[in-house]
């Protein structure tokens, strides 16, 4: 039943030893009525050349709906597993518009393989990466999620900072840090603008929520939440910045939207985009 899936890949097989990073799930193939599962690698040794590649590869295989949550699907590979596989690369006609050309797994030759070269890759992966930035402070790289995490002072208050980067591309680290510094350098202006946008977009909704809160004695009909009050009561808790200069700011809403958070989206180039409640 998986003929349509395997037809997207070249017939030639390559034998490899792969270091699995993690399974990232799969998309549903509506035409073939099956799931396409995907794991990404930390490293691959191509057996014909003995070449070690640390470029992330995507390895895919098809499963039925019943198999998806079994040892044939999500449980087929474990994080940091080293295994010997036979794989086939996707045909150009299917992969030409993709950022990276995936491979399909045609056979698991050996589920667990000893490979000193890939063990060295794994050992290097486990080494912590910490940057000491004079403005942003200590930033620690979460390699699994391609993000640096730290804490900054935003208008005198502690705010969690996340920098979304490509863990394998140090220039992206520099760009994300630069974007965060630009936001921080003009934090008074950005903070005021974000609060004004939230107040403009969400004050009416805040009063609707208040009217439905039976435990709150305040009557929005006679004592409504004003835009000024809403802008004052929210507080920035975390900020996420990409290497391209886009950012997302999360605000605590002082229970005006129960346990939901207020999020503001924007970019350095285009300014603020929108404000929503989420969570």
Which residues fall in each region the model found?
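Structural detector for short beta-strands of small beta-barrel domains
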Residues: 1-47
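Short, structured beta-strand/loop micro-motifs enriched in basic residues and often containing a Trp
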Residues: 40-69
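Short nucleic-acid-contacting surface segments enriched for D/E, G, S/T with interspersed K/R
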Residues: 67-86
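OB-fold/S1-family single-stranded nucleic acid-binding modules
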Residues: 86-122
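Extended, Lys/Arg-enriched charged tracts that mediate electrostatic binding to polyanionic substrates
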Residues: 119-140, 226-246
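Contiguous hydrophobic, core-forming segments of folded domains
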Residues: 122-190
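Long, charge-rich alpha-helical interaction segments
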Residues: 161-226, 230-233
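C-terminal structured interaction module
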Residues: 226-279
